[in-house]
Amino acid sequence: MLATTIAGSLPKPSWLAEPEKLWAPWRVAPAALTEAQRDAVLIALKDQESAGIDVVTDGEQSRQHFVHGFVERLEGIDFAKRVTIGIRADRYKAEVPTVTGPIARRAPMHLDDVRWARAHTARRLKFTIPGPMTIVDTLADEHYRDRGRLAMAFAAVINEEARELAAAGLDVLQLDEPAFNVYMDDVAAWGIEALHRAVDGVRCTTAVHICYGYGIQANVDWKKTLGAEWRQYERTFPLLAKSRIDQVSLECANSRVPLELLELLRGKDIMAGVIDVATHEIETAEQVATRIRAVMRHVEPARLLPCTNCGMVPLPREVARGKLRALGAGAALVRHELSGSLPDRRAPEASEGAPTANKKNG
């Protein structure tokens, strides 16, 4: 009950990449990079376990960017042919590679990452992969020239990868789809179908993370234009409620999304963002607990997973660690209230989160 998790990324150590920066280049020589990334994963796992996080991730320590860290290993994408485009409906500009041929997966991409993390934690393990629509929105395309067709091509390679990750002991596969609250017509036209193709036959819990983005200035400024209530989810949640995805996320910390919209997701597990990633202020346990209680007016505790609003890679490491501790402690307070027992301030015992491979759990 109230199993805690994070949206995905954690800050990288300064010896691995420039801190507090998206797209930060590696600071380690190529010959030593894999070992350095794996060391960083061990730190990320330890930070989460020490904070009492129940469903842990590798913190995306082996990826420079949540999208390009996946697609850089695919055929059909030319990273030498970079162009500047507007992404997320022109919210901000980014220099991106170009699709120049058929998308294909030449070999497993993140299988070794999952095996490494799986071997070093007994907690339930989640791994994040960008969703088809968000990938399409973060690339230039000179080959398919149709966003829906390109999304289905990415869904196919995601599915190949996801099946292997689940077979390696992954408990939760999360597809990151921040584009889902930008292109609502496309969500209905082909976005949900692309998700279904991506998770077809994947034998673990599936999740979709939809959000208003990292806590970077471009996103902060954009959110100021959205009015007093953010109701974009009113169009996407009914579609997701009918989908085959198990878990859906929503930002609930310093958010203008009406929490009653969660009732459109009856039957789904909810990853509720109760940690604000757009500020360096570290929440108290009571602040987190208050946010969890507010969500519980609309979601039963058995279906609620307290979470971060989004990834925390742009934050200072000590801020992110403090927010992890607040998340774990706040959830413990509410569990105490629900059970009538004394709150356990320690990290949960490893046996509580023991994985069950190839099976729905989480």
Which residue ranges define each predicted feature?
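Domain-level signal for soluble alpha/beta catalytic cores
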Residues: 1-362
